[in-house]
Amino acid sequence: MQHRPINLEEKFGLFHEQWQPKVIAEMNEYQFKVVRLEGDFVWHSHEDTDEAFIVLDGVLRIDFRDGAVNLGAGEMYVVGRGVEHKPFAEHEVKLMLIEPRGVPNTGDQGGARTAQNDVWI
């Protein structure tokens, strides 16, 4: 068994497309995903799970029907299960998501922004 740390900058260097989460590690049934975001996403919710957003670079706004939260580099926020939300980034954001394996990025909405799931880099 090889014991090596995962270098996040190296992982971000392997892809440039946005809104396409890539799995970099798994712990129990949870996946750690890195993703580049810019612009507006779709309103959606995840009925069966919470979703953790950790901003590594840039500024992310997560809109809710009753307000918003702004996250800068080094900050995180957990969106509770069933809470409708919509991420937005004026400029590119590098982000880590932590969520159970198999959770679609568009939650209950589906559509053109739905990324292929379980893509490892």
Model segments located where?
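A short, N-terminal "cap"/entry segment at the start of jelly-roll beta-barrel domains
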Residues: 1-33, 110-121
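Conserved short histidine dyad/triad with adjacent acidic residue
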Residues: 17-18, 31-47
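A cytosolic small-molecule/anion-sensing beta-strand core signal
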Residues: 28, 56-57, 72-73, 91
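Structural motif
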Residues: 31, 40, 59-61, 68, ...
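Short, conserved beta-strand element in jelly-roll/cupin
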Residues: 36-37, 46-63, 98
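Short glycine-/acidic-enriched loop or helix-start segments at secondary-structure transitions
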Residues: 64-65, 73, 89, 107
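Short acidic-glycine-tyrosine-enriched beta hairpin
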Residues: 65-82
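Ligand-binding loop in jelly-roll beta-barrel domains
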Residues: 81-111
